[in-house]
Amino acid sequence: VRTPDGRYIIVRGRLWRASNPDLSNEERQALVDALMDARRAVGAAKRAGDETAEKAARADVHRAKVSLGERGPVWWDDGAPDQNRKLVHNSTYAPWWESSEHANPD
């Protein structure tokens, strides 16, 4: 589920910043590929017990997420605050969420 403005996805009641929609499909896919490679590298480093490689792979994950717009400075320019990782019912989206079918699925 995305917020009406498309800035966040909601997973288990928590807001997670969505990727920057201004990225081209090609840019976005290249960054997602880099992110997934970095995540696999984190797992491989952990399994190998290689703390140096794990730290480097985690830095690659962070860089990819910043480039996607999911971390770092917000990608919108209207001055709205970043509500990443907030519970949706504790955010400015609470009224919308409570009135939506997603908040109270029957």
Q: Which positions does each model-derived feature cover?
A:
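Extended, charge-rich alpha-helical interface modules
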Residues: 1-106
